[in-house]
């Protein structure tokens, strides 16, 4: 894992510097490319010695949902030419860290037993931003095993207010 981070860091830093004031757009297309590159079949295709850089580029850009800007195309070609397709997800993660550091925000993943939308999500967001003391970029994922409540992951901090966590605490207390 540390090796991937070491390989990805220069790419993420170069893209961060080159993106300038357009960090949001760069993050969007980089996340899309990272999701595509995470596909095992694509990695096998790209790793095939009989497949050219152009063929790999055409497949990835063809799968992309949106039209890639020139900066994205150039970045993708560079990554493919250097044989770093498998590192794209880590590049995207490190780019987000740099982007968040500049804006003073953090990524937060909210795991919930039930869908969170509208006012409920806005209330939760306001409460969590107050709790963590910074602006949070939310991603909500359903996890029915929580039974109720939410589990929030912000960097290396976890706030677990789920029913499942409370039941586990009660179990530990009763067994002790």
From Swiss-Prot:
GO molecular function: proton-transporting ATP synthase activity, rotational mechanism
Domain of life: Bacteria
Recorded topology in the membrane: Peripheral membrane protein
One Pfam short name: OSCP
Coiled coil regions in record: none
Function: F(1)F(0) ATP synthase produces ATP from ADP in the presence of a proton or sodium gradient. F-type ATPases consist of two structural domains, F(1) containing the extramembraneous catalytic core and F(0) containing the membrane proton channel, linked together by a central stalk and a peripheral stalk. During catalysis, ATP synthesis in the catalytic domain of F(1) is coupled via a rotary mechanism of the central stalk subunits to proton translocation.
PANTHER family recorded: ATP SYNTHASE DELTA CHAIN
Subcellular location: Cell inner membrane
Xref: InterPro entries: ATP_synth_OSCP/delta_N_sf, ATPase_OSCP/dsu
Xref: NCBIfam families: ATP_synt_delta, PRK05758.2-2
Recorded family membership: Belongs to the ATPase delta chain family.
Gene3D superfamilies for this protein: N-terminal domain of the delta subunit of the F1F0-ATP synthase
Name of the protein in its database record: ATP synthase subunit delta
Organism: Polaromonas sp. (strain JS666 / ATCC BAA-500)
GO cellular component: plasma membrane; proton-transporting ATP synthase complex
Subunit structure: F-type ATPases have 2 components, F(1) - the catalytic core - and F(0) - the membrane proton channel. F(1) has five subunits: alpha(3), beta(3), gamma(1), delta(1), epsilon(1). F(0) has three main subunits: a(1), b(2) and c(10-14). The alpha and beta chains form an alternating ring which encloses part of the gamma chain. F(1) is attached to F(0) by a central stalk formed by the gamma and epsilon chains, while a peripheral stalk is formed by the delta and b chains.
Entry keyword set: ATP synthesis, Cell inner membrane, Cell membrane, CF(1), Hydrogen ion transport, Ion transport, Membrane, Transport
């Amino acid at each position: 894992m540390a090796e991937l981070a070491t390989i990805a860091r220069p790419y993420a830093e170069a893209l961060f510097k080159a993106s300038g004031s357009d960090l949001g757009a760069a993050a969007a297309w980089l996340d899309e490319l990272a999701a595509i590159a995470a596909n095992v079949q694509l990695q096998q295709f790209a790793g095939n010695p009989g497949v050219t850089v152009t063929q790999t580029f055409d497949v990835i850009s063809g799968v992309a949902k949106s039209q890639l800007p020139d900066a994205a195309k150039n970045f993708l070609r560079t990554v493919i030419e250097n044989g770093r397709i498998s590192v794209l997800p880590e590049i995207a993660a490190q780019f987000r860290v740099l982007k968040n550091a500049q804006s003073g925000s953090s990524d937060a993943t909210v795991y919930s037993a039930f869908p969170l939308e509208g006012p409920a999500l806005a209330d939760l967001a306001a409460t969590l931003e107050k709790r963590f003391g910074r602006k949070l970029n939310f991603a909500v994922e359903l996890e029915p095993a929580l039974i109720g409540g939410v589990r929030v992951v912000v960097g290396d901090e976890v706030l677990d207010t789920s029913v499942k966590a409370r039941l586990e605490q009660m179990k530990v207390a009763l067994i002790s």
